[in-house]
Amino acid sequence: SIRWALLASQSIGKSTSTNLLRSDDVLNTLNCLKKLGVKIYLFKNKCEIYGTGINGYKYKKNIVLNAGNSGTLARLIMGLLVHSKNKIKIIGDKSLSKRDFLRVTKPLEKFGAKFKTNFGKLPVVIKGTKNPIPVKYKENKGSAQCKSAVMLAALNTKGKTIIKAKKSRNHSELLFKHLGIPIKIINTKKYDLIKIDGKKKIKSFNYKIPSDISSAAFFIVLTALSKNSKLNIKN
């Protein structure tokens, strides 16, 4: 859901999703995008996002984006802000503020953006560059978040960004392909080689977000631990 919202914000026109997860992390994502000038309408059965296009965010100076408890949101949105005209501060809750962010700010700095951290942690202040440059990045930790942040930065960067990433979740790659974003992926046993041509327009799109079994994991474990309990998981 977070990835859909971020990519929809980069498209041109109205994108619609159904089955959007209504969690705090996703709602914080929508709130952050609204602060960046994206129009969003949340209905009972769908969500509409009116994308601003590549490099199209419009916002006031020195805004603060609150990622709450979402490391996915905090790291991925940094990738979309490597071209930000004004300084943007990203904050989070007490738990998120204890986590390391250098592993994502370091590769994003290669695009030309500047990051100021609190000893590697939140808050993070971003000062983007008008002309981000394509990079070659090797990701050795198997972090889907770091890989995705660089992929999103590549969207706003003219030229070809090349990522050699240790095997990890491929949600971002699947969405890129679905949207027709110029991406080439070469799979090997341990690594994926990802090539992205940036600065290409993204058309608005309709998307039914797949259900995520991890959201049901808590109830599955609780049922397994409780005698005479039954759980029916649908969709």
Segments predicted by a language model, with ranges:
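Structural preference for solvent-exposed beta-strand-turn elements
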Residues: 1-235
